[in-house]
């Protein structure tokens, strides 16, 4: 059997789509604000 194609990594996920990564850029901050405005329970993936 071959390996599956998706080998997930928690560290990579957090570095790319975590809170600190979102706060670094203006567009990331706007994403967080939109999710807050929408009333999301979780504002980021992690």
Swiss-Prot record:
Entry's localization field: Plastid, Chloroplast
InterPro entries per the UniProt record, alphabetical: Ribosomal_bL34, Ribosomal_bL34_CS
Pfam families: Ribosomal_L34
Keyword Ribosomal protein annotated: yes
Residue ranges, annotated region (Disordered): 24-46
Family: Belongs to the bacterial ribosomal protein bL34 family.
Keywords: Chloroplast, Plastid, Ribonucleoprotein, Ribosomal protein
UniProt GO cellular component terms: chloroplast; ribonucleoprotein complex; ribosome
GO molecular function, a single term: structural constituent of ribosome
UniProt-recorded name of the protein: Large ribosomal subunit protein bL34c
Record keyword Isomerase present: no
Gene name for this UniProt entry: rpl34
GO BP field: translation
Residue stretches of biased makeup (Basic residues): 35-46
